[in-house]
Amino acid sequence: MELQEVLHMNEGEGDTSYAKNASYNLALAKVKPFLEQCIRELLRANLPNINKYIKVADLGCASGPNTLLTVRDIVQSIDKVGQEEKNELERPTIQIFLNDLFQNDFNSVFKLLPSFYRKLEKENGRKIGSCLISAMPGSFYGRLFPEESMHFLHSCYSVHWLSQVPSGLVIELGIGANKGSIYSSKGCRPPVQKAYLDQFTKDFTTFLRIHSEELFSHGRMLLTCICKGVELDARNAIDLLEMAINDLVVEGHLEEEKLDSFNLPVYIPSAEEVKCIVEEEGSFEILYLETFKVLYDAGFSIDDEHIKAEYVASSVRAVYEPILASHFGEAIIPDIFHRFAKHAAKVLPLGKGFYNNLIISLAKKPEKSDV
């Protein structure tokens, strides 16, 4: 099975669907001030036709209500900043392209659009037709839009997904080179770490180059991704997932070879690695780069560690179940996340269960002829 066929969130609206379980409202709340500042700089840059329309894309949009939470924040930021900066002008039409892989459940988003448009008109005064939302399926590691056609590109929790599992893991190091691990965890051998970093560098460089070509000169890009932290004893969600799968091997429910032959196409970069790749690629100026933390159970009101742990397990399952099921089989998925919840219940009370996040705002450098 092709990797892109299983790189999608759980579909539909069931208990383990992405629509029901993914909750990154706190991350969006932390990102919003940066989003508003990015939009403010964009409107001041006087890009082509920006007073008439603004063309935006959300790269790696996923599915369900969270997709439209991002869209809402983008629209609200454009309207708020527009009123502050150019209140004598009419609101520009906003065209938003939702991008994800072909297998993404776009229909779950489209079903929400009628109520979303009505709410936008009620709360923002935006008449239906002044905000146009459509899908642009395809890998964001390839061309999506014509050259110099976009004003603003946004991506949240997507660029840590690689285009493929690093080929060097099998070709150069051999099957099982990443023994006992499912990604480039802290305990991996240096050659495994290098293989993952090399793949991320290649993919992220391609991402920057291709999308810089799609942006107008001085266009903006705002990226939020999971990043490495300095805490030696912290556990991210993939660490807990790895521990859960290892439990099944130790208990005899899963063959060791099955674990050793599985590697997630995910790399969690450091802030310095991201900064260096952007500078080396050269198409963008870094306007600002900051990091922040989000607890796994942030915003969860029930004060019960086991219920919180089940909630975290459901959220992580919504993201990783398709790719796990394609390798390990669907039957063992409940067992994986039952053990995941047990590990989560241990780290949550200690404050060690959180995501480190990086947010970076980029401006496309002008062509020499534009200077």
UniProtKB/Swiss-Prot annotation:
Judging by the UniProt lineage, the source's domain of life is Eukaryota
This protein's cofactor list reads:
Mg(2+)
Binding-site residues for S-adenosyl-L-homocysteine, renumbered to this chain: 18, 61, 66, 100-101, 139-140, 156
- What keywords does the record list, in alphabetical order? Alkaloid metabolism, Magnesium, Metal-binding, Methyltransferase, S-adenosyl-L-methionine, Transferase
Functional pathway: Alkaloid biosynthesis
The Enzyme Commission number assigned here is 2.1.1.159
EC class: transferase
- Enumerate the catalysed reactions: 7-methylxanthine + S-adenosyl-L-methionine = theobromine + S-adenosyl-L-homocysteine + H(+)
Q: How is the cofactor bound?
A: Binds 1 Mg(2+) ion per subunit.
Q: Name one GO molecular function term.
A: metal ion binding
Q: Where is this site: Involved in substrate discrimination?
A: 154, 266, 330
Q: Which Pfam family name is an example for this entry?
A: Methyltransf_7
What does the sequence similarity comment in the record state about its family?
Belongs to the methyltransferase superfamily. Type-7 methyltransferase family.
Q: What does this protein do?
A: Involved in the biosynthesis of caffeine. Catalyzes the conversion of 7-methylxanthine (7mX) to theobromine and with a lower activity of paraxanthine to caffeine.
> Would you tell me the protein name for this molecule?
Monomethylxanthine methyltransferase 2
Species the sequence originates in? Coffea canephora (Robusta coffee)
The gene designation is MXMT2
